[in-house]
């Protein structure tokens, strides 16, 4: 095994051989997120090459201005992912997201989404034993990809129906870390089936000991905290009310809380509760120790076929679940996929998530991952998430997104509307077939938007060897386990930031409280 990578194939399918040394791979350039500023220093951005560094870490022969990386070394067939250099170090300065501008230079107007109605559809996750769409547990380090990491407890349980808190709840007494872990996530979800999740005003600052800052952004930061009651570690996202209002993020912030309050799934991050004071909003979430899939992908350059399949399968189950609840996610990308300490994925950042039963027109997302109907300002539905899954699979297999060309975001949009994708010869035939049916502008042919819905994706031949029930219950060993110690607040995978808590808990007039009545 290559010691500093440690990625194993979770499936029996052989890894397709890599291209010859003459084959070139492109390194994705940074692209802005539309419409929503990030609350994390690196979230919602494609990686930037530091102009002060003359070489890309994994390919010494390439300068930062180059659009290609020459001489990618081959992947070990069947089992291992190569290490092609040290982990790419992200720039620590804040990188605020930007919005699309029209030809006149003015930001596009956000059109309100349609009224919503409850969904009657059931996801495959639910049919395999997970909670129905009425379950009201939540998840997120929303908007803070570098800030979130796997839960310090497994599994994370919601508050029980009878009002008795489960062992992992922040307000309960200390428990043995190894106790209570024999239950599968499916069993946990079944137990939560009729639970009512109330998050408003559940905690106060006095319930937690603040440990350190995990990430910062344009209108907030995320802290690692320890519950004074059960001594477990959590992530508390703090948003400054004045900044949220100033940057016109009130609707997205409230949507994020609402979506996370409703969802409960093994591959979605959990929101335990919210509270506020005169100056700030607080969201108590799982602490996900393992970091972003983005970092692992950049370190490895690209994944073998079975490794990409494992992560894509977990994402597909999460999307299937969200869609059964009429929730469109709209911001799928490696930066928003976090690895828990066991190596399973957690989707975070629900700032763009929206409950939409039919179509919506809101322009939001990351340029590389936008579907053509979004770029063209047409009404769109849940199928945009399946398009994004195709882009994600392509990036995991190739190391770059299909419509990136090193130019401006507008050039990316032109490429998306043009719709021409060049598939490298080393992509597995089944994977290529799936991608061609996901990354298609024709909605009558896009998988996930057809008669059988998400099942047309899950039953595709590329996923043939996936046991979905075992995957949902986390019985399939992940290909990579992050080098962190669980249960002790190990934040070694996060950069250090100057601490700032002086504005927390101060009394005074609450000028913006009426915007956030549900916190």
Swiss-Prot record:
Residue segments, region Disordered: 1-195
Under the heading SMART domains, the entry gives:
S_TK_X, S_TKc
PROSITE patterns noted in UniProt: AGC_KINASE_CTER (PS51285), PROTEIN_KINASE_ATP (PS00107), PROTEIN_KINASE_DOM (PS50011), PROTEIN_KINASE_ST (PS00108)
Polar residues compositional bias, start-end: 10-25, 116-159, 173-191
Which residues does the UniProt record annotate as the domain Protein kinase? 208-463
Keyword NAD listed? The answer is: no
Family per UniProt? Answer: Belongs to the protein kinase superfamily. Ser/Thr protein kinase family.
- Which residues are recorded as binding ATP? 214-222, 237
Gene Ontology terms describing biological process: adenylate cyclase-activating glucose-activated G protein-coupled receptor signaling pathway; negative regulation of gluconeogenesis; negative regulation of induction of conjugation with cellular fusion; negative regulation of transcription by RNA polymerase II; positive regulation of protein export from nucleus
Q: Does the keyword ATP-binding apply?
A: yes
Entry's EC annotation:
2.7.11.11
- Give the AGC-kinase C-terminal domain ranges: 464-519
Annotated active site residues, numbered on this chain, are: 331
Q: How is its activity regulated?
A: Activated by cAMP.
What does the entry list under GO cellular component?
cAMP-dependent protein kinase complex; cytosol; fungal-type vacuole; nucleoplasm
Q: Which UniProt keywords apply?
A: ATP-binding, Kinase, Nucleotide-binding, Serine/threonine-protein kinase, Transferase
What does this gene product do? Functions downstream of adenylate cyclase to regulate trap-development for nematode capture.
How is this protein named in the record? Answer: cAMP-dependent protein kinase catalytic subunit
What does a knockout show? Abolishes nematode trap development following exposure to C.elegans. Decreases growth on rich medium and leads to a conidation defect with only 1 or 2 conidia per conidiophore.
What Pfam families does this protein map onto? Pkinase
PANTHER family tied to this protein: CAMP-DEPENDENT PROTEIN KINASE CATALYTIC SUBUNIT 1, CYCLIC NUCLEOTIDE-DEPENDENT PROTEIN KINASE
MF terms from GO for this chain are: ATP binding; cAMP-dependent protein kinase activity
Q: Which reaction(s) does the protein catalyse, per the Swiss-Prot or TrEMBL entry?
A: L-seryl-[protein] + ATP = O-phospho-L-seryl-[protein] + ADP + H(+); L-threonyl-[protein] + ATP = O-phospho-L-threonyl-[protein] + ADP + H(+)
Q: What class of enzyme is it?
A: transferase
Induction statement: Induced following nematode exposure.
Q: Identify the InterPro entries for this entry.
A: AGC-kinase_C, Kinase-like_dom_sf, Prot_kinase_dom, Protein_kinase_ATP_BS, Ser/Thr_kinase_AS
